[in-house]
Amino acid sequence: VPSSDVTVPDLMANVRITAPVLSIVKGPQTGAAFELEDDVTTIGRDPANGIFLNDMTVSRSHARIIREGLGARIEDLGSLNGTWVDGAIVNAAPLHDGSSVQIGTFTLIYHESTPERIETGE
């Protein structure tokens, strides 16, 4: 293996990791998208949540998404109507790119973090 003076930090200097995104594809707020920039994002009918879903089918504190490296998982917080991932009711589940999340009347799609090359002009 040839040696090189280029290190991993050097290679990553021109790369930005975008935050994962949760997009509403069905429900009262269709078209809205939320960047999951925090380590933990709460979802619910209470406006204090990171993702506020204003509908009576959503519990005040319904679920939370926990970022883990480049991925994430969702946990139900004891909601009345449950949290569904890819058609199955879950207490907790990993999220993958394209995962469908149903919370009340809302259907949301999870989009993973992605590395993005930053143009340096060199």
Question: What are these model-derived regions, one by one?
Answer:
Residues 102, 113, 120:
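Short Asp/Glu-rich motifs
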Residues 30-107:
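Forkhead-associated
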Residues 1-54, 66, 116-122:
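Intrinsically disordered, low-complexity acidic Ser/Thr-rich regulatory segments
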